[in-house]
């Protein structure tokens, strides 16, 4: 999800998103090198007027252009596999958040606390304040402590949705009758925006997600005040 006047990925707010950005840059460098090499060879052959009548095969060059792509794929596959295992690893979460997708809003439950659950609707344009973002702000934000491991359980009640926060590197499908889970670690305070990333009906574009990251002390105060 791009932001205003920005062609790059969003600034990361978690270690996993940093690793995703590093992998993206790593792969992009390899692709640029391949593009330059292939482009140079094609242009050279296009302007080359020499003909060799007797060169029917070249085992060495065939061996080279078979091995080089394999080595290139290894350089892409190894960091990718490492990142996949990191994204699936779940280590002693402090808090479990349950997210339930509906047409067209989200419900949240803090499973570790009693009676902390709420619905989160997009703020309509006619009710927006001057500091709200159009189609992104909600009436009830998710409040989470930074510098702690968070587990999120995602499901849906009607159709398939997808719970996504780009700056945290999180995208989890919400399937009816199924509970998916992932984890993330927010390493700085702030407000982070996301949206449903699976087409789920007429108002698919109007079910944003907002996370407010605060210190653990302020989070405890928020829990006490909410209770």
UniProtKB/Swiss-Prot annotation:
It is a multi-pass membrane protein. GO terms for cellular component: mitochondrial inner membrane. Binds a dinuclear copper A center per subunit. Keywords: Copper, Electron transport, Magnesium, Membrane, Metal-binding, Mitochondrion, Mitochondrion inner membrane, Respiratory chain, Translocase, Transmembrane, Transmembrane helix, Transport. Cu cation A1 binds at residues 161, 196, 200, 207. Residues 1-26, 82-227 are mitochondrial intermembrane. Its EC number is 7.1.1.9. Cu cation A2 binds at residues 196, 198, 200, 204. The keyword Repeat does not apply. InterPro entries: CcO_II (IPR045187), CcO_II-like_C (IPR002429), CcO_II_C (IPR034210), Copper_CuA (IPR001505), Cupredoxin (IPR008972), Cyt_c_oxidase_su2 (IPR014222), Cyt_c_oxidase_su2_TM_dom (IPR011759), Cyt_c_oxidase_su2_TM_sf (IPR036257). Mg(2+) binds at residue 198. It holds the Pfam family COX2_TM. Component of the cytochrome c oxidase (complex IV, CIV), a multisubunit enzyme composed of a catalytic core of 3 subunits and several supernumerary subunits. The complex exists as a monomer or a dimer and forms supercomplexes (SCs) in the inner mitochondrial membrane with ubiquinol-cytochrome c oxidoreductase (cytochrome b-c1 complex, complex III, CIII). This is Cytochrome c oxidase subunit 2.
């Amino acid at each position: 999800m791009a932001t205003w006047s920005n062609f790059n990925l969003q600034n990361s707010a978690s270690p996993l998103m940093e690793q995703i950005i590093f992998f993206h840059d790593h792969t992009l460098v390899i692709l640029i090198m391949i593009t330059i090499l292939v482009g140079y060879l094609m242009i050279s052959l296009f302007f080359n007027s020499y003909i060799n009548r007797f060169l029917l095969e070249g085992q060495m060059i065939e061996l080279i252009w078979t091995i080089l792509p394999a080595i290139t794929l290894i350089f892409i596959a190894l960091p990718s596999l490492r990142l996949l295992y990191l994204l699936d690893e779940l280590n002693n979460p402090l808090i479990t958040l349950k997210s339930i997708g509906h047409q067209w809003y989200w419900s949240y439950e803090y499973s570790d606390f009693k009676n902390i659950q709420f619905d989160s609707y997009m703020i309509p344009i006619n009710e927006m304040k001057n500091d709200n973002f159009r189609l992104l702000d909600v009436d009830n934000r998710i409040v989470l402590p930074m510098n702690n491991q968070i587990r999120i359980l995602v499901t849906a009640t009607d159709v398939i949705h997808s719970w996504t926060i780009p700056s945290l590197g999180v995208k989890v499908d919400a399937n009816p009758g199924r509970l998916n889970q992932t984890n993330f670690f927010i390493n700085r305070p702030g407000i982070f925006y996301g949206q449903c990333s699976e087409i789920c009906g007429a108002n698919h574009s109007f079910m944003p997600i907002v996370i407010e990251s605060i210190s653990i002390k302020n989070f405890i105060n928020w829990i006490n005040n909410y209770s």
